[in-house]
Amino acid sequence: MRKLKVLIGGAESVFCDLRKAAREFWGFEVLEIADGKQACAALRKEHVDICILDWDLPRMTGLAACHWIRCVELKTQPYIVLLTEKGRPEQVQAAYAAGADDFLAKPFNAEDLHFLVSTFAQKISRLDLTSRELTHLDPLELYRRDLPAPKIFSRL
């Protein structure tokens, strides 16, 4: 299984710990960014599986970056987790409206974030496996498997 690439953006010490955990304990390849504009530039250049963005990123907020990511045509759309100081209902609604896949309020438990990310990683792994299976099947076999045999042929 390939290493997932995670883009992490935030300046607080919690993000330093998060980057270290993502590299050392969770086994991800980590891209570090300092602001929302850097996040957008990195996503234009590189395939990223997961974006973990602080709501309060400088130059472009995590919310604005999330909206940009969903509006721009990228090769693949990453799974986006927005993190914020306050988990007010209007912030949660704004995050999901901007295209976030998940939302966590700070202070958050690293285990909660790891659960979100590892669940997504498992889904990616299953999709990769299904994709490999489908690419190795004979197209006629797919046709035969998915379509019922016509009645005229079933009597033969």
Which residue ranges define each predicted feature?
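Acidic catalytic/metal-coordinating carboxylates
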Residues: L4, D35, T61-A64
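Two-component/phosphorelay signaling modules centered on CheY-like receiver
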Residues: S13-L31
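Alpha4 helix (beta4-alpha4-beta5 surface) of REC/receiver domains from two-component response regulators
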Residues: K20, A64, G87-D102
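Short amphipathic alpha-helix used as the core "switch/output" element in two-component signaling
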Residues: A41, L63-T76
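Active-site beta3 strand of CheY-like receiver
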Residues: H47-L53, L57
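C-terminal output helix
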Residues: E90, F108-V117
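CheY-like receiver
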Residues: Q122-L156
